[in-house]
Amino acid sequence: MPNPKNLPTYYDEFVESAKKTKKSYALSTLNIFTYRYRLAESFDGMIAPEVGRTLTGYNVLTKVFLAYTAYESIVKVSRQLRVKNVNQFELNVIWNSELAIRLRKNEKLKTYLLSRKNDSGLDTKLKNFFDGSTSDIICVAYALRNVFAHGDLTASSVGTETIAKRKIFTALANTILDYCDDRFTDCLDKL
């Protein structure tokens, strides 16, 4: 649970630990993480009146994108600090069976992500996710991040047209941010 400034829960403790640590190599990445986290946690949407209802879909996808950038930073620094149970990006997982079930019900999302050409590792993870073999939700966020940042993703192509569907994407972003907040706390124990 973030603090009122939308920074990680133990941000104040981080500031104090940063003054004392001998592991200065990790401080830069932890700082980057805290501000990426704050942006993702604080993000409430863009203002573009002429775009119309499509903007609400882009807003939830942007929140997932921002949460994933925070995730990238925390995984990197967690690995540097040798935090337990954090693997390299292609092997790291975030399990959430309830959210996985909700994501799998979005047929547009499934069709869109499975039709994209990704690296073979991500393709395999997505197939396993959508066939119910795994509840690792981070592969969905990673695929969304890729097509959002580098591809031809539109908000309607992944099923963001209803409030209920948009709430699932918000839940995906929030689950990633919760994971990040927990790993940040683990990192503090290693400083």
Please tell me what each predicted stretch does.
Residues 82-136:
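Flexible secondary-structure boundary motifs
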Residues 1-7, 26, 92, 96, ...:
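Intrinsic-disorder-associated interaction segments
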Residues 35, 58-69, 133-143, 167, ...:
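Short, well-structured alpha-helical interface segments that form or flank functional binding sites
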